Amino acid sequence: MIDTPCPAFGRRFVVEASNSDPATGHGHERDNQADCEIHATRTATNQRARFFLRRGHWVEVYDDDTKELLAGPFDPDQAAPAYIV
């Protein structure tokens, strides 16, 4: 398999992992956010989102510039989606 990064043409993605459902408003409270990473490729973004889901975290993906929610929130108790970003 050839692993070629998928360029996002200058777009950066923020992967946020939290310990509770961010849709309830609790995901952004202190100590509920497990991690936050910024990636420049869709490939890296997808890999890290799946990494956090496998570890039981809720996951959301945002556009770093516009702060627009692009994907999620994904429930770690559900099957991972086939497409994230």
Residue ranges with predicted function:
Residues 11-21:
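A short beta-strand micro-motif
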Residues 1-3, 39-48:
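Charged, amphipathic alpha-helical segments
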Residues 13-15, 49, 59-61:
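Hydrophobic beta-strand residues in large extracellular and virion-surface proteins
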Residues 8, 42, 52-54:
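Surface-exposed coil/turn segments at beta-strand junctions on protein surfaces, enriched
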Residues 1-12:
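Non-catalytic signal-transmission and effector/linker regions of two-component phosphorelay proteins
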Residues 21-28, 67-70:
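Short, surface-exposed beta-strand/loop "edge" segments at domain boundaries and coil↔beta transitions
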Residues 53-85:
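Short, mixed-charge low-complexity intrinsically disordered segments
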Residues 27-43, 72:
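A short, exposed loop/beta-hairpin motif centered on an aromatic-Gly-Thr core
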